[in-house]
Amino acid sequence: MEQNEYNRPEEETSLPENRKSDRKFLKGAVTGATVVLIAVACVFGGGKLLRYFITGGSYASGSVSEEDVNDKLDLINALIDRYYLYEDEVDADALVEGIYSGYASALGDPYTEYYDKEEAQALLENTNGEFSGIGATLTQASGDTGVTIVNVYKDSPADKAGLKAGDILYQVDDHEVAGEDLETVVSWVKGETGTEVTLKVRRGGEELTVTAVRDTIEVQTVEYEMKEDNIGYLSVSEFDKVTYDQFSEALDSLEEQGMEGLVIDLRNNPGGNLDTVTDMLRLLLPKGTIVSIKDKDGNTEELTCDGEHEFTKPLAVLVNQYSASASEIFSGAVQDYGTGQIVGVTTYGKGVVQQLTDLGDGTYLKLTIAEYYTPSGRSINGIGVEPDVEVEYKYDENDPDADNQLDRAIEVVRNEME
């Protein structure tokens, strides 16, 4: 199985049950690349002596022969076996995984990464935009021993069980939350669809016990509302496989409400599925190229739009320094065609494509395989998309809910409407 996807530039501190606090998840889908399996591991001597056969021609051999690699690994393992103080605690499987992970990371590419089985499962779950759980977002403040529910999805098992944003979770089934990290607590809450989980929460001075039946939850990646003067506001948190349908439904709803202009908010959107972002742009752009992708051999693929659904109303796209990858494909294309104005600050600057390959045993390799270019031929890698209207975010202590960047984007749209 191969997928081409986009990596995340930042970690999350608030996690739906399908999120990992320390992962850099990639997103997207492009076809046609090939990945070579670069390592095979065998375990000898009761699991204590590991021998690795490095294959793959010039990509793996370099100036060091296969025999040299094997001899050095044999020596390292012999030294561990002979002298290592904590020999009884050695996990042979973990050593194997460390070889694979280190091999990928030694490329020095921040977007190339090896995923073990557990990480790969979470990765694929995240990419699909669906997970099995109760439909709640959890957060844990730095140094805090408690876990707070910050969001409950509408009509989710959590909602039906009566959980509310602000509830403090202190026990999951028989597990005490105090002293545990957020990722561990999330893993307790998750589980197979149809199974029950008992949660104990504090709400004000009251302690409550609720039971929720886990179900398949679709991550809500699109939020929208109508602002004053019939200006629609549509926020996209990431480009998952479920995002296109949510985006299309949001556009239709805003149109039905009499929308005369639109703000699309991509701030803090780390990227996502390439098919998703190109499909979304086909609802906005005129006929032409959406994005071009060039591999190491110079082969180029153009993804195009037929222009049948071109958006002609005033449009502003909000971005910031954490708008990355697929978000930059979106904003770059809108900017190149003049479909709307880009408002905010220069984006992250990730203009490369990763391919995700199943290594056959449930583990995956994510490998950078191509660079992408906006419709005008711009590479934004390491550069980002510069806004048409630059606005730095300013926090207002007197009004924490104030958003000067959004206010400016609305002003831009309003001016175009006049």
Write out the residue ranges for each language-model feature:
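Intrinsically disordered, low-complexity repeat and linker tracts
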Residues: 1, 9, 50-57, 259, ...
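Terminal targeting/pro-maturation regions of precursor/exported proteins
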Residues: 2-111
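Cleft-lining beta-strand/loop regions that shape enzyme active-site pockets
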Residues: 15-18, 150, 159-161, 165, ...
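PDZ/PDZ-like domain segments forming the peptide/carboxylate-binding groove
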Residues: 36, 62, 66, 129-171, ...
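Extracytoplasmic/secreted envelope proteins and their assembly/folding machinery
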Residues: 70-73, 77-81, 96-104, 108, ...
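Extended, small/polar residue-biased N-terminal targeting/export presequences
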Residues: 81-148, 196-197, 204-211, 418
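Short, surface-exposed linear segments at secondary-structure transitions and domain or protein termini
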Residues: 216-224, 378, 391-399
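Conserved P-loop NTPase
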Residues: 354-358, 365-396
